[in-house]
Amino acid sequence: MKKKIKRIIKQCLSIGRDSINFAAFLVEMIFKNKLHNSFSRRYSGKVAILANGPSLKEVLPKLQMDKFSDTDFIVLNFFGMEAVFTRIKPKHYCLADPMFFHPNHKQKEVRNLFSVLNRNVDWDMNIYTPIGSVDDFKVFSALSNPHIRLVSLNTITYKGFECLRHFFYKHGLSMPLAQTVANMVIYVGTNSGYQQIGLYGVDHTFFDSMCVD
């Protein structure tokens, strides 16, 4: 009986905690005006995510082969400086690092990238940024290319009932923590409607420094 009572109390406390967190999440979402779905345009078929890990070098020469002939691309960071950029014509471009929104030590390289995007993009392309940085990005990038569409992502962190998490993710009202831009591009790929997603250059070194004594 005691175990049953403890279990009931534990469940009640869990429901109470989730209710408070969920209410706080809704209040934050409403007051920060983050009620829009970033993914009003839907896509289908295959998409290849091209991150900037070392293994991408092996893939770059193959991007114009038949394997990728019916594939859309999502790229990130400085991919616009790659020679293959204007040949594969990516539909999606993700930027999450603050260096793309504010003056910084890499400002020269960033300005060069924006110049390339303004000058060379002659196809329709979406650029995705966190919603909190979109105004800074508009000013800092000074992009005026009519082919480029800016899409702001609701980066508010979901809190509350676990069963509702994916509803808010699916409708673009929240997203997983963008600890790396790779998280952002995977989120964009899955929420854009594609049935198949290929990952290239999504490498990490999280465990390289770990060892067992």
Predicted regions and their residues:
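Metal-ion/cofactor- or nucleotide/acyl-coenzyme-handling active-site neighborhoods
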Residues: 2-213
